[in-house]
Amino acid sequence: MSEPSPIADPYAYLNIVNNPDGSITRDLSNFPCTAATPDPSPLNPAVSKDLPVNQLKSTWLRLYLPSSAVNEGNVSSQKLPIVVYYHGGGFILCSVDMQLFHDFCSEVARDLNAIVVSPSYRLAPEHRLPAAYDDGVEALDWIKTSDDEWIKSHADFSNVFLMGTSAGGNLAYNVGLRSVDSVSDLSPLQIRGLILHHPFFGGEERSESEIRLMNDQVCPPIVTDVMWDLSLPVGVDRDHEYSNPTVGDGSEKLEKIGRLRWKVMMIGGEDDPMIDLQKDVAKLMKKKGVEVVEHYTGGHVHGAEIRDPSKRKTLFLSIKNFIFSVL
């Protein structure tokens, strides 16, 4: 039996069913999950473990440390940058322990030689935005106050980067906006930059890339429309600031990001329907005085490096250069 077409039936494509109470039923059979890997092994790019964040919200995180930091009795005192990575899924699907995200974060930890903190967040429509943003900020507080041994021994609190893929890129962007007003409260954590990997943005008016890629088989506009309908606050449209950062000439907080000298890396694929809006957001940030590094790859669909490990090497090299340019 063939896979459902995203164009013909976006709900079937997403494996979700609307319920009368406003929730959705998710069929997660296409999203295999994996356990953390706490024991060092030459086969694992990173060791990892799961830790609770807020038990009342059932939020937690997966912490990754490069295997090189613990293999062969290595007790190096080298402090590593912290990459806070928010997973994708249109705010309605997926989880920290999904195999694709676990493998991606493990390789980020190894290739960037960084501690990766991948927090969970509450999903919509059961918890509409800004719930995910609240949880994303709370994860920063967790890092700041954590007594975890990996954090205490290896984390460089002065070099924190917010990163995310798709909805996670949107989340990293909005957590960054929120954080500009709480720099002193976050101390000793110091955010140095945002790494927005194929960030999930949208607007009411179709962009040229959305029109060109209307029949995209990965993440077409008809599918992202459903995701926004389920995740945005009730009664708003896609020109809300959560989905469309360019509305009203953007947030005034972007200028604060510029003054704080946080750098931003905007990563996109030319075959992603969202590419034009991603470029528009990058242009807006530059206008507001933010230093933006843009990395766009021809032929790449939405989330290409998550889906295809062979595409990660070039991406990780670019991100590594970006981080080194900030340190």
UniProtKB/Swiss-Prot annotation:
Gene Ontology MF: a single term: 4-hydroxyphenylacetate decarboxylase activity
Entry-linked Pfam families: Abhydrolase_3
SUPFAM superfamilies reported for this sequence: alpha/beta-Hydrolases
Keywords: Hydrolase, Serine esterase
Enzyme class: hydrolase
InterPro entries: AB_hydrolase_3, AB_hydrolase_fold, Carboxylest/Gibb_receptor
Reaction it catalyzes: a carboxylic ester + H2O = an alcohol + a carboxylate + H(+)
Regulation: Esterase activity measured in vitro with the synthetic substrate p-nitrophenyl acetate (pNPA) is inhibited by strigolactone.
Tissue: Expressed in roots, stems, flowers and siliques.
The keyword Electron transport is assigned to this record: no
Function: Carboxylesterase that possesses esterase activity in vitro with the synthetic substrate p-nitrophenyl acetate (pNPA). Binds strigolactones, but is not able to hydrolyze them. May be involved in the regulation of shoot branching.
Family, as annotated: Belongs to the 'GDXG' lipolytic enzyme family.
Name of the protein described by the UniProt record: Carboxylesterase 20
Naturally occurring in which organism (per UniProt): Arabidopsis thaliana (Mouse-ear cress)
Name of the coding gene: CXE20
